Amino acid sequence: MTATDTHRAIDAVWRIESPRLIAGLARMVRDVGLAEDLAQDALVIALEQWPQSGVPENPGAWLMAAAKNRAIDRLRRNQMLDRKHEELGRELENRREEVTEASMAHLDRALDDEVGDDLLRLVFVSCHPVLSTESRVALTLRLLGGLTTEEIARAFLVPEPTIAQRIVRAKRTLADKRVPFEVPRRAELAERLASVLEVIYLIFNEGYSATAGDDWMRPGLCEDALRLGRILAELTPKEPEVHGLVALMEIQASRARARVGPKGEPILLLDQNRAQWDWLLISRGLVALNRAQELGGLRGPYALQAAIAACHARAHTAGETNWSQIVALYDELARRTPSPIVELNRAVAVGVANGPQASLDLVDALMGEPALANYYLLPSVRGDLLKKLGRFEEARSEFARAASLTNNARERALLLERASSLGG
């Protein structure tokens, strides 16, 4: 294996192993920031040694052993003599690992026994509500996604120093607030889980419909969010909304190839070539949706949105779509989590089921909603309805307004093209 091949292997190992490595270390040292530093130290050692010695049989255990030994050395060097660190130092000293194949195999088995609980703790800490939404997203992608600061910055079109500052501030806040490395108690589990799901779906949505930049989609973010969702579903198998979110992301991701034209232009749902949809992802999404439904209880917002996505997925042509069922699902979603955006989406479904005038009446009733004042999809939807009603001049004005409100270049180009197609 060449040095280049080894470095590629190390990158792949790091992306897979870093979340459980950081999670295991965080449990040991009780500090997420220190845990990441130790994991990075282990990575540096691997980069130095593996090109000569080769990638070990149990790379995750090797990295954990190296990181634990590094923790002992760091504690000694910093002379942390208070009782807590003395106890921690003795605990780690008792666990000091000689990096041999036998010890790595033993450690790998031990990690497998504890990795689920540790990962779940890391998920909840990374998405803790004491952090801002931006910090939660950045920290989650860094600690659980294995992304570098540069990769996160590139994905969100944000300067790298900005992302670095968010991550540093997040780790400092967790330490200052003494956020425990634990799974929340039952009384607060629902609220904390909602925060986790929000972060994962924010990551997915930024990949699925980029809010800014020159690309309409950033598939890498969708893949990162899907991977995090699948991991969470394995760790919390009895939480229906987790399976609902996974179902929603799987089904939406299935359309990725069909959503973008050969020149990068957006292709709207009803215009997509459904033969290009990924039916493996659809089947996985339907399985996850069934799992959410089997667990019972009130359907949450993610499960309901997944059920709506499933209506589209089950229709082999746009004409086969059961729009009445979609309207009914939006009715339920509006009762469960009322919001102007849900009402706007419901109005779109009503327009297909009952005609554009019925939809326009609903959309016009939303025109005064403060939450939609600068939301580009409101004039975009209204423009589409006005066009169908033959009110072309008004439609052109609405498409132009929508174009002025979006920060995505592809979306803007599509809206301006729709406006220009109406003359004037």
Spell out what each predicted region is.
Residues 2-23, 33-36, 190-198, 202:
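A short, charge-rich alpha-helical start-of-domain segment used by transcription regulators
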Residues 43-47, 57-86, 91, 171:
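Σ70-family region 2.3-2.4 aromatic/basic alpha-helix that recognizes the −10 promoter
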Residues 78, 86-134, 142-151, 158-331:
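Amphipathic helix-loop-helix modules that constitute alpha-helical solenoid scaffolds
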Residues 25, 35-46, 66, 170, ...:
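Short, small-hydrophobic-rich alpha-helical interface motif
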Residues 245, 249-252, 305, 309, ...:
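"A position-specific structural signal for the A-helix of alpha-solenoid helical repeats
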Residues 14-32, 45-49, 124-128, 209-212, ...:
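Amphipathic, Lys/Arg- and hydrophobic-enriched alpha-helical face
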